[in-house]
Structures are given as C-alpha cells and as structure tokens.
Regions:
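Glycan-processing catalytic domains of CAZymes
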Residues: 1-280
Length: 280
C-alpha cells in the first residue's frame, strides 16, 4: 500500500521521486486500488485526455466517503479505462503488488469484471517482464473460483481488548458480516491469506483497540498474532501506519488520528516488532 489511491488519483511524478529516494535494495512496492473516488478529481492520461470520475460511480453511493465522493464500479467503462491506465503506469515504474480495496463494493452483482481486469494487469506485466501479485479485500465472498483469481486475500483479524480473536467467520460485534478471512470458510478457498490490524478510524476497529492497550500488551498481542497465523500458513502484517479515531485515548503517532510504532512517538512498538522479525 505504498501507493495510495483513496479519494485521490496517483501522482506518478511524485511516486517516481519518492521511489528514487529509497536507498534500500529489493523493495517491493504496492498499489492500493481504493473503493473511494473523488468525483471532481482533475486527472488525465498521457495524451491529455481527462477522466470523468463522475461516470465511474455506482449511482447509489453518492457522497458515501464524504462530499463529492462515491464508490467506483467495475461495470463503468470509464473506470476500467482508468484502472488500465494507472496499473500500467505503476508496472512501468516497477510496482509489483496490486490490492483491490473492498472489491465487493467495486464489483458488479454478477462478479464478471474482475477476471478481465486482472488478466489485463497480468498480461501487461508479463509483456514488461515484471513479476506481479494481485490481491483483494474480498470480505464475505466464498466463491472458490472468484477467490482463486487472486494471489492473496487480505483483511483484519478482529481482536478484542485482550488481544484475542473470535472463532466464527464473522465479527460478532457487527450486525452485517465483517469477514474474518483467517476462518476456514474463506482461507480454505484462497491461495494465500494476509492479515492485519484493520483500521477505519473508529474506536472499535482493530487498530484503535490495539492502541488502547499497554505497551507490554501490544508487544504480546503482536507476537501472539504473528506466531499463530504463521503457524497456520498465513501472513500477518505488522502495523506501520494507520488512521485512529482522534478521541481514541490510547497511544498515537505524529498526530492523535494516526498510529505509528516509531520510538519517536508515544506507542514505541518499534523494538517489539523488530524482535519478532528477528526471532528473539
């Protein structure tokens, strides 16, 4: 998720400059293909043709993520053209991982567009000699054929204040099914499962719950989650940045609405994360 597209099209000149400044070798860059668009975004392709973001919207999702926003739909020819443009530009820069945010919000009810979109990304990457992986936040989708389109599926773990996870396929404290993708009903049909502390900027999400724990409890929780999911042949992604509810009351990063493990801020989880990766 190094390249974020939430409510904002990717600025490839800025991305190129930032990638050039990263000195560490063999870094794998990823692009997050977000389920949120700004209908008034001013953005054009390399020939100067401007995209019409209003045409990309699911008509029933006006202002769903704030003023002038919507959820895009794969059924829009304009949106598919935009996706082709940004994914190809990213591949040209060497981006190797593409993840669709909450793909069930972008897909049609027939789920018949993802195969075409994914095939185009893979074919272009192959033509350019770039190895890519494609993932998605697939929610409660259990269609084995659909899940098999992706190299990985990704979602939150659903922790409580003790750092424990539940046993069911859906988080019990939500009315609709907030899918726990580590559950066999999903994981058993996917090629790979990546898990993280989910964040949406509300007090009951994974990251806010985590940030309210003591430093010792946070370290223990990360170690337990990492050890458990790796033992289940799944990946657990350590929290390096995320959005918090600014009234959360726990530790935070550079501002109250952001989490950071850096020792420069109040959470100071950096050493605990490093120790886990080093097997200490």
């Amino acid at each position: 998720r190094a390249i974020e597209t939430w409510r904002e099209p990717p600025d490839f000149e800025k991305i190129k400059k930032n990638m050039f400044q990263v000195a560490k070798p063999d870094v794998v860059y990823g692009m997050f293909i977000a389920e949120a668009l700004d209908k008034k975004a001013d953005y054009a392709d390399d020939e100067g043709k401007k995209f019409d973001f209003g045409k990309m919207c699911d008509r029933d999702t006006q202002n769903i993520w704030g003023e002038h926003t919507c959820e895009p739909t794969f059924s829009s020819r304009e949106y598919r053209g935009y996706l082709k443009f940004i994914t190809r530009k990213a591949i040209d820069l060497g981006v190797q991982s593409f993840m669709f945010g909450q793909i069930y919000r972008q897909e049609s009810s027939m789920r018949n567009y993802a195969p075409e979109i994914i095939r185009d990304i893979r074919n272009y990457a192959k033509k350019k000699g770039v190895d890519v992986v494609i993932g998605a936040q697939t929610g409660s989708i259990t269609d084995a054929k659909y899940l098999a389109l992706f190299d990985y599926i990704e979602g939150g773990v659903g922790i409580d204040g003790r750092g424990d996870i539940e046993s069911g396929p859906c988080l019990s404290r939500k009315e609709s099914c907030w899918a726990l993708l580590w559950h066999p009903v999903y994981a058993g049909k996917a090629k790979n499962v990546l898990l993280h502390l989910d964040w949406t900027g509300v007090t009951y999400d994974d990251l806010d719950v985590f940030a309210r724990m003591s430093q010792k409890k946070r370290a223990q929780t990360l170690r337990n989650l990492y050890s458990y999911f790796v033992s289940q042949d799944m990946g657990f992604l350590m929290p390096y940045f995320g959005v918090l509810d600014r009234t959360n009351g726990g530790c935070f990063g550079p501002k109250k609405r952001f989490y950071s493990p850096s020792d420069a801020y109040s959470c100071k989880d950096e050493k605990a994360i490093t120790a886990i990766f080093e097997g200490k």
